[in-house]
């Protein structure tokens, strides 16, 4: 009796890998063994960078808040310290958004925190 290899499942697995590798350069998108390595590495980068994205955005928000704070005569660290002492609870994302979109409101926040 011939050996059963379940070719339906094998083909589906290969198709799934090649579908993920669609658009990759050269043999990375067409040859299964090369595509398998490329897809594995891409998924590792995706996993890592979902975590790095959080750090990157926090860093961006801090830069924006610092730039706006310096326009108002203080620094980021002094502003955050003053806001904590006055119990002004605005997260960095919202504060950065206010700093960019509504500088007048940000100035009021700085005055109330520093005042």
UniProtKB/Swiss-Prot annotation:
Superkingdom assignment: Bacteria
SUPFAM superfamilies: Ribosomal protein L20
GO cellular component terms, A-Z: ribonucleoprotein complex; ribosome
GO biological process: ribosomal large subunit assembly; translation
InterPro entries per UniProt: Ribosomal_bL20, RIBOSOMAL_L20_CS, Ribosomal_protein_bL20_C
Gene3D superfamilies the UniProt entry points to: 6.10.160.10, Ribosomal protein L20
GO function terms (MF aspect): rRNA binding; structural constituent of ribosome
Matching CDD domains: Ribosomal_L20
Pfam families the UniProt entry points to: Ribosomal_L20 (PF00453)
Keywords tagged on the record: Ribonucleoprotein, Ribosomal protein, RNA-binding, rRNA-binding
HAMAP family: Ribosomal_bL20
Function: Binds directly to 23S ribosomal RNA and is necessary for the in vitro assembly process of the 50S ribosomal subunit. It is not involved in the protein synthesizing functions of that subunit.
Record-stated family: Belongs to the bacterial ribosomal protein bL20 family.
Name of this protein: Large ribosomal subunit protein bL20
Species for this entry: Chlorobium phaeobacteroides (strain BS1)
């Amino acid at each position: 009796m011939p050996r059963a290899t379940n070719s339906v499942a094998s083909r589906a697995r290969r198709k799934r890998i090649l579908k993920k590798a669609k658009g990759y350069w050269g043999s990375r998108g067409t040859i299964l063994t090369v595509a398998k390595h490329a897809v594995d590495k891409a998924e590792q980068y995706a996993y890592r960078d979902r975590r790095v994205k959080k750090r990157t955005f926090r860093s961006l928000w801090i830069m924006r808040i610092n730039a706006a704070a310096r326009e108002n005569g203080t620094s980021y660290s002094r502003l955050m310290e003053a806001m904590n002492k006055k119990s002004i609870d605005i997260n960095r994302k919202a504060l950065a958004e206010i700093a960019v979109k509504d500088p007048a409101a940000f100035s009021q926040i700085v005055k109330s925190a520093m005042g």
